[in-house]
C-alpha cells in the first residue's frame, strides 16, 4: 500500500517503512508527525479526492540534516566584480510508520 503526500511544496510517493528526505519539519528527532494533505492512496482500490479526509499518513522524525552545497557565481563584465554565494537547504529525514 502506498500514498502520495504533499509537504514542503513537493509531492512524495511513500509506503510504510520508507525513509524520506523532506523539507524541514519542526520537531525533535523521535517525535511523531502527521503528513497532510494526502493526495492519493492505493490499496485494493485507488482512493482520491474527497474520500481522503479520513486518511492519515503518520511518520517519525529520524534526523535533521542539510542538502548538498549549491554554489552560485555572480560576475559583471569589465568591472572586476565577482561574488560567490553558497546555500545548503535544511532537510528532515522521516520514517513512515503508518498509512490509515
From Swiss-Prot:
GO BP annotations listed = translation
On whether Flavoprotein is a keyword of this UniProt record, the answer is no
Q: Show the InterPro entries listed in the entry.
A: bL21-like, bL21-like_sf, Ribosomal_bL21
Q: Which GO terms describe its molecular function?
A: rRNA binding; structural constituent of ribosome
One family name in Pfam for this protein: Ribosomal_L21p
A single GO CC term for this protein reads:
ribonucleoprotein complex
Q: What is the top-level taxon of the source organism?
A: Bacteria
Q: Which terms are listed as keywords in the entry? A: Ribonucleoprotein, Ribosomal protein, RNA-binding, rRNA-binding
- Name the family: Belongs to the bacterial ribosomal protein bL21 family.
Oligomer and partners: Part of the 50S ribosomal subunit. Contacts protein L20.
Q: What does this protein do?
A: This protein binds to 23S rRNA in the presence of protein L20.
What protein name does the entry list? Large ribosomal subunit protein bL21
Species of the source: Corynebacterium kroppenstedtii (strain DSM 44385 / JCM 11950 / CIP 105744 / CCUG 35717)
Which gene is annotated as encoding this protein in its UniProt record?
rplU
